[in-house]
Amino acid sequence: MKRVLIIYTGGTIGMTRTENGYAPRAGYFRAALDAIPDLRAPEMPEWEFYELSPLLDSSNMTVREWNCIAELIAQKYDDYDGFVVLHGTDTMAYTASALSFMLDGLDKPVVLTGSQIPLCEIRSDGRDNLITALLIAGEGIVREVCLYFGGKLLRGNRATKYSADGLIAFVSPNYPSLAEAGISIKYNEAALLPRQEGGLKLQTCLLYTSDAADE
């Protein structure tokens, strides 16, 4: 059975209601996943869960977090067949693009996804986005960093956020979709990257501080 690591960074998909609006809460989302029986269906890949700390609204995502995500994938690369990164929508496309260059030689799926409506709400789009992202990561047909949202799988460094309130939140104006999910997941084979040789090479981003900039 294929094994997938879910990396939860924060974002709308795992937020809960608070007195001050929606906010992420440590430990909540892992328990929420256990309440979705379809995630353990026979056709699903085996998955494990890793929660970053602290959880972030993606508007606060920085190069430091990009390095953390990329380093975690590199550390776990030989243990899993694919990866799903749960992320807020505000900077999801930026993170996907950054990871596509940081994970040089990647030959496994890294699928970023999230939701416009929290999983705790009845109309959440998070359940379908997560389940389909897990299936894509487990199938291993796409071997690159990509972004799945609203029925479309997009190349990570070609995606851009299109809508703040629509469920089809991302588009790829300059490159075709890698796959579309309807009754089945249909891959656009001509758009996929070929297999990579030579193994994964991690390229971390430099962190610049104000002190360094003044030197």
Regions found by a protein language model. Give the residues of each.
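Conserved small/polar residues in nucleotide/adenosyl-binding loops
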Residues: 208-215
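Short acidic/histidine-rich motifs immediately flanking catalytic phosphotransfer sites
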Residues: 79-81
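Nucleotide donor/acceptor-binding cores
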Residues: 2, 108, 143
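N-terminal glycine-rich anion-binding loop in soluble enzyme alpha/beta folds
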Residues: 2-75, 157-207
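Gly/Ser/Thr-rich loops at beta-strand to alpha-helix junctions
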Residues: 11-13, 87-93, 152-154
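Short Gly/Thr/Asp-enriched flexible loops that form oxyanion-binding sites at enzyme active sites
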Residues: 86-107
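Predominant activation on well-ordered alpha-helical scaffold segments within soluble catalytic domains
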Residues: 67-70, 74, 96, 100, ...
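Internal gly/pro-rich beta-alpha loop/helix module
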Residues: 112-182
